[in-house]
Curated annotation (Swiss-Prot), chain B:
It catalyses: phosphate(out) + ATP + H2O = ADP + 2 phosphate(in) + H(+). Its EC number is 7.3.2.1. It comes from Nitrosomonas europaea (strain ATCC 19718 / CIP 103999 / KCTC 2705 / NBRC 14298). Keywords: ATP-binding, Cell inner membrane, Cell membrane, Membrane, Nucleotide-binding, Phosphate transport, Translocase, Transport. PROSITE patterns: ABC_TRANSPORTER_1, ABC_TRANSPORTER_2, PSTB. This is Phosphate import ATP-binding protein PstB. The lineage of its organism: Bacteria, Pseudomonadati, Pseudomonadota, Betaproteobacteria, Nitrosomonadales. The gene is pstB. Signal peptide: none annotated. It is a peripheral membrane protein. CDD domains: ABC_PstB_phosphate_transporter (cd03260).
Length: 309, 266
């Protein structure tokens, strides 16, 4: 039998193919550009907010901005205290979260641990539908249905209130919280649940004592997303909460939030470059910092309760 | 070809702990267990052996009604538990009550995302035990019985995930022991472990056989020979042969059992 001659190849067959190399580099470059673009836009927005806010802070001191209790940039007696807008944002978000987090979590526990397959397959699309309704519809739902309904119980409730806006915002956020929480809980491996069942735990005990702690980082992420959405939500509060910047801590009053104020000024006829107009950048920067704090908090939580199976 | 040295040096009990009568089990329309009759003797180790897919894990999981967790599973026949003389597969029997008395250790160590102490205390806590002194005593006892106490007594508050694989498996055994089960089910408890950890788990099972009735599923025939008093050989959902481990390994009655044990197939 002849021994195959290994040297009988055309010379240079091992050489690097420049065509393939070039193709790979082009693909790599395109992927890099796609990733770079989103990072670039983020930084561009931050740059814009900061540079425009600096113009604003040349007219108004940071101290006044943070401590003044009135927000009246459009009045003759102008005050530039962000607190009324922050309080409006905080109260409406708080009301929304009091609704969204518990209900979202309960729905997630039910769908992930209790619901039979068919129920889950029917219920999930409906929940997602709830998340697909335009926010402006929720706004009118709050103004024209929820507020009158609440007024039958609370006769003193004004036509615009943080309570009504917050409640509806909460209903709106439920699907986000429940779907992310459910995903986190469902990703807990079955053998962990079986370990709990095998020593006599009920489904509820297993859900609360084993599945939830095991998926804590995912649940924390879901909660943070819910909070971010509540803080950044615009339409519902713009329609149902009124637009007067009041420093209130009572949800049964009308008030403006940071977002509604930005909408109000953007749609108004203030000249560009005036201090009044620059206020929206300072307000926007405040909003960005608020959500940034929550995102960092979420990141820390994720690291603290990293899933290890 | 090799004949394994059977476990020796300990007395065979003939007190019945559980009797399996004409057990059939179905995953939906698929029959996984066919007409199984078997005895489980008290404070003895019974090994279930057989090739992959023969139904030995399915059979084991019948004993604490794990199949109830998934839809469309269906039992027929009886598993009588003594001293109650009750069929634990009966619809009137609460699977949670069964699992309180018949506990299970799994193939892959599955500690909960909790501290070492809370992992072992879990079974007690879900039964409503709150007194710290009782919890501490029972946890220590369970960890001692699982031969883990000396290694973890100074770090009971550490997360269980920080333990090695073998330690995690012994922790799972301690977790199952903490509630004083009557029967302990092992589903291939060493298949995810290295040889040294495997040896320590086997030693532990040998120690435990005087305290609790044990059923163990294993792929490893040497392991069955080393740790068990009784062996059941299963094939295609049927129980082919059941008897004292010495008999099964030295002179099996059935040709199929002999072929499997001597490594001619499987």
């Amino acid at each position: 039998m002849p021994i195959p001659n290994n040297t009988d190849h055309s010379p240079g067959s091992l050489r690097r193919s420049y065509k393939r190399y070039l193709k790979e580099r082009v693909i790599e470059l395109l992927l890099f550009l796609a990733a770079f673009l989103s990072v670039f836009i983020t930084f561009a927005i931050i740059y814009l907010l900061i540079s425009e806010s600096l113009v604003f802070f040349e007219h108004v001191s940071v101290w006044d901005f943070l401590t003044d209790t009135q927000w009246t940039p459009l009045f003759d007696d102008a005050h530039y205290g962000i607190l009324p807008l922050v309080s409006g944002t905080a109260i409406s978000s708080l009301v929304a979260l009091v609704i969204a987090l518990p209900f979202g979590t309960i729905i997630a526990i039910y769908l992930s641990e209790f619901a039979p397959f068919t129920v889950r397959e029917i219920a999930k699309p409906f929940l997602e539908l709830l998340g697909g309704i335009p926010t402006v519809v929720y706004g009118y739902f709050a103004l024209l249905f929820v507020t009158p309904l609440l007024q039958t119980i609370l006769p003193d409730l004004p036509g615009f209130s943080l309570l009504s806006a917050g409640l509806v915002m909460g209903i709106m956020i439920i699907p986000y919280v429940s779907s992310m929480t459910e995903d986190a809980m469902r990703s807990v491996p079955m053998h962990l649940r079986e370990g709990s069942y095998a020593i006599g735990a009920t489904r509820f005990q297993t859900a609360i004592k084993v599945v939830m702690p095991a998926s804590l980082s995912g649940i924390a992420a879901a909660y943070i997303l819910g909070i971010s959405r509540a803080v950044g939500e615009t339409m519902v509060v713009a329609i149902a909460a009124g637009m007067q910047p009041n420093l209130v801590w009572n949800p049964m009053e009308p008030a403006a939030t940071i977002t509604t104020y930005i909408v109000q000024v953007s749609l108004g006829d203030l000249p560009h470059g005036s201090v009044g107009y620059q206020t929206i950048f300072a307000a926007g920067l405040t909003l960005l910092l608020l959500t940034l704090v929550f995102n960092i908090l979420g990141h820390l939580l994720r690291k603290r309760y990293r899933e290890v199976y | 070809m090799q004949i394994f040295k059977p476990a020796s040096g300990h007395t065979h009990s003939t007190v019945q702990k559980s009797v399996v009568n004409k057990l059939n089990f179905y995953y939906g329309g698929y029959q996984a267990l066919k007409n199984i009759d078997m005895m489980v003797y008290e404070k003895q180790v019974t090994a279930l052996i057989g090739p992959s897919g023969c139904g030995k894990s399915t059979f084991l999981r019948c004993f604490n009604r794990m199949h109830d967790l998934y839809p469309r599973n269906h039992y027929e026949g009886e598993i009588i538990l003594h001293p109650d003389n009750a069929n634990i597969l009966s619809p009137e029997v609460d699977p949670i009550e069964v699992r309180m008395r018949i506990s299970m250790v799994f193939q892959k160590p599955n500690p909960f995302p909790k501290s070492i102490f809370e992992n072992v205390a879990y079974g007690l806590r879900i039964r409503g035990v709150k007194r710290r002194s009782i919890l501490e005593e029972r946890v220590e006892n369970a960890l001692r019985n699982a031969a883990l106490w000396e290694e973890v007594k100074d770090r009971l508050g550490d997360l269980a995930f920080n333990l090695s694989g073998g330690q995690q498996q012994r922790l799972c055994i301690a977790r199952a022991l903490a509630t004083d089960p009557e029967i302990l089910l092992f589903d291939e408890p060493t298949s995810a472990l290295d040889p040294i950890a495997t040896a320590s788990i086997e030693e532990l099972i040998s120690d435990l056989r005087n305290k609790v009735t044990i059923l163990i599923v294993t792929h490893n025939m040497q392991q069955a020979a080393r740790v068990s008093d009784y062996t059941a050989y299963m094939y295609m959902g049927e129980l082919i042969e059941f008897g004292a481990t010495d008999t099964i390994f030295i002179k099996p009655k059935n040709k199929q059992t002999e072929d499997y044990i001597t490594g001619r197939f499987g």
